[in-house]
Amino acid sequence: MKITLPDNSSRELPEGSSGYDLAKDIGPGLAKSAVAVTIDGVQKDLHDEIMTDSSVSIITIDSDEGLEIMRHTLTAQVLARAIKNLYPKSKLAIGPTIEDGFYYDVESEEVISSDDLNKIEEEMKKIIKSKSSITKKLVSKSEAMKVFKSNKEPYKEIIINESDQDDSFQLYYQEDEKFVDLCRGPHLPNLGFIGSFKLTKVSGAYWKGDSNNSMLTRIYGTAFNSDKDLQQHLDNLEEALKRDHRKLGKEMDLFHFQDEAPGMVFWHPYGWNIYKTLQSFIRNKLDKNGYLEINTPQVVDRKLWEASGHWDKYRENMFITEIDEEHANEKRVNALKPMNCPCHVQVYNQGIRSYKDLPIRYAEFGSCHRYEASGTMHGLMRVRGFTQDDGHIFCTQDQIESETALFISLLSEIYSDLGFKEFDIKLSTRPEVRIGSDEVWDKAESALENAIKKLDYPYKVDEGDGAFYGPKLDFVLTDAIGREWQCGTFQADFNLPDRLDAEYVGEDGNKHHPVMIHRAILGSFERFIGILIENYAGKLPFWLAPQQVVIASIVSEVNDYAIEVQELLKDQDVRAEIDLRNEKISYKVRDHSSKKVPIILAIGKKEKIDQTVSVRRIGSNDTEVLDLKEAIKQIKKENSIQH
């Protein structure tokens, strides 16, 4: 049979050869590092037979795919077995990989806490030390059920029973065959390939994420090919904890959450300063780029959500209200809007539109609500109530490319001003199930791609990952400690204008549906503020800082001068506060430095007489004495985004 390799070269191998046979045929070095194989785009175990002509690539342990497989094997074959060894009555649920790691969910009569992680790690090391080979058996549904019924693993039985498969269930064993797990694979050929690992935390998780089901114990871990890479990751985790926006939010008195309004932010004055400043910044950019700001209702009748199609797809995530309307035969059912797009179409639909009116760019700081399960919420990063920097562009097919280019330029400018000089772009193309003709899709995909190319931005294509109603662009930021955040989106939509009867009169005198482009730059204010706080470790750029300047008196006799300085700074639109407390200046400096105040002006008798201020900047132990007018001039300059 003919095997085609990634470089388009080919080799002839006997039918039934494995990926390992191919690796050996290519060279002993490759065979030594091979851990799995990709056959016609599908990952398989290294020793799986290849039966027909195929395109094949070998996955090595030092590749990203190899690392993922190592983590998968570690959770499914090592962590799971260690848990069963230490807690024989425990029941195994699922053990997937996640970004930079893995977890396993188990039901245990004994409490498993973070204090037990070292013990579990030691048991895992014993298992790895065996360097046991891992073998796979393919069995029927009834055979798989029999195995896990015998092993008293009810969660595995549920998974098997709910599967659409009738055969080819994959059971993975180690050499002694004393442990078996159900898994899609692939796995490492043996445990000797496992590198460095660390169990990181224990938490609770509902089976299938449903609060009506059993609460399970979730054990998290991470793994890398070397001690160095593992330590770097653990150092990053430690740094991330220091930067946690929830911790800094409390220290800086920015916001809080409470049980009476789960997932809803209580913004404090300083946090609201950040929010307002960011909103004003975005509003100014949008205004300069031809956007028309609108505001639409938060509570909308279900009829609109049914017409848009969101009622069927989003109902479980909506907050729904019922109102007894006067003289009505039945209650009126409304929903808090989970997104703004159907409402924006209603604004567009007021009046007759001509092709000469297009493009129309609407923007809204839209307050939205979506129900998120309590276990998924995470500070500002995932909430139930949020504000989107939302926008919708109504344009013709011929205008998609120019609108794409304008949007990317605007997004780039905003990200740069906020401190993110680079970003990644992902283009998601047509899925198999879609609406619209191939001609329309060709035109839209080419428009997005051409705009990126003309602006000379690197990008990658995600084939088939677009929405059923149009291709899209995703924009991903990388923060100061290397974490990626998908924020911006640009999504073409051929569906909603049709469903909601959005039209324009074309040059031909006939009515046409416009293309509707959903776009956002920040995503949501709440999440983006969380990202900013963590990116800057609370030390936000001066123009965005919640408290920009604190004037701290050294003695009470200079309080009047401190107030005068504050007023002069406020006249220059600087967020300036005074600290006249009867405390030592060293205490005041420490206190305000801990709250990440960029500039502290210390004022004593000498400063008052000389009309100067002692300037202390965050992160520096040095103090600079400046003439008051010069200090205000410098601070005013720093308050400009482009200073």
Name each model-derived stretch.
Residues M1-A93, I98-H643:
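NTP/phosphate- and nucleic-acid-binding module
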